[in-house]
């Protein structure tokens, strides 16, 4: 007989109906009810006990656990990122892991199909957040906030095919920094790019490049090349793939799959394969076709100003004007940017290789207005750091160089060589904790000294305090350096001060 706790809801409903039949019910009713219960039980598809043993314990596809060693690496990365955000005056903010489905729909273009939808018994249609930008815009509109500089570190979810080796998952962290409010052009945008440079330099990931463009320039290119306005989004998503596939393949997609005329695709190719610095911006100002488009001229004007500010910030050499940059998300309205790591070429004449995007962002002046009942806009610009991609790179380097990672921050271990000293150890470690010293002890009444010392060596704990019968009589504590194995006797009342002194010097 199957366990009652495993009965499906339908079987319970029918069974309760059988146990409480209506007054005067005929026997034939009971017979039919028996039959219905049997059908419901068979429909439950309960697996036999022997099949249950085949169940594989694992994490869902596209997710993973992080070991203590991995958590240390991640926390160090997040410390660098968040410290930079705070250095630039950002306030912390958090939003729910899931939003009303209506909040997220029609904000991500072709990527909208990657949103996780939830079933809710309360009747609301819900979805897991796809990024941290749309919830931020909803927060601004809902709370009537007109100016804010905020950072947010949190998980997001996407139903894409995960590629673990490339650091892509279905559940992952994002670290966002955004500036909301009406300000003079390009000053907040330049600060966002400066922040990108500070973070990537601080993480010591190697050489990097920030590609920058403007959605207005891209739309202007499409217009002067003859792309129908109804195809702008579709062609934009194709151009956005140029960092992954060749122009030949992108052109094929435009013409064959999206119905663009071959000559129009060729004209687009003349533009989107260009990249350079401020000189390319000046060149585009002189372009006979692009210079006739108002949108493109506005975008080029802002980029020229942006490069002036980046020069003052001392980071202009890290930024390249790249006309192939598209950023497929629908909510971008102006400047867009993306940071990529560069692999040093084998030969001097070769160009650096693109190892993939590790940060991205842009301006989205219309997103908040989508949530405001009166359509009031709050201009915004921001960036997102790709923590998972960075984590994968750092983790691989640690494995390559065989670096050892400490999984705890313990500074002192309280040890004893003798039996029946648990009470003294507990008093001593409480004193260390109260003084703000990170300390551990072994959870045994009578531990042996050698395993305690081995534990300190394995965990990288720098100091050991040793208390025994002789030390207790003399009113001292032995302080041992794990690295040098040198021991000194310290007066009991001076122990905390001596430990703090040594830790400050290390």
UniProtKB/Swiss-Prot annotation:
One of its GO terms (molecular function) is histidine-tRNA ligase activity. Its EC number is 6.1.1.21. Coiled coil: none annotated. The modification N6-acetyllysine is found at residue 444. One of its GO terms (cellular component) is cytosol. The keyword Mitochondrion applies. Keywords: Acetylation, Aminoacyl-tRNA synthetase, ATP-binding, Ligase, Mitochondrion, Nucleotide-binding, Phosphoprotein, Protein biosynthesis, Transit peptide. The modification Phosphoserine is found at residue 67. Transmembrane segments: none annotated. Belongs to the class-II aminoacyl-tRNA synthetase family. Homodimer. PANTHER family: HISTIDINE--TRNA LIGASE, MITOCHONDRIAL, HISTIDYL-TRNA SYNTHETASE. This is Histidine--tRNA ligase, mitochondrial. It comes from Bos taurus (Bovine). The gene is HARS2.
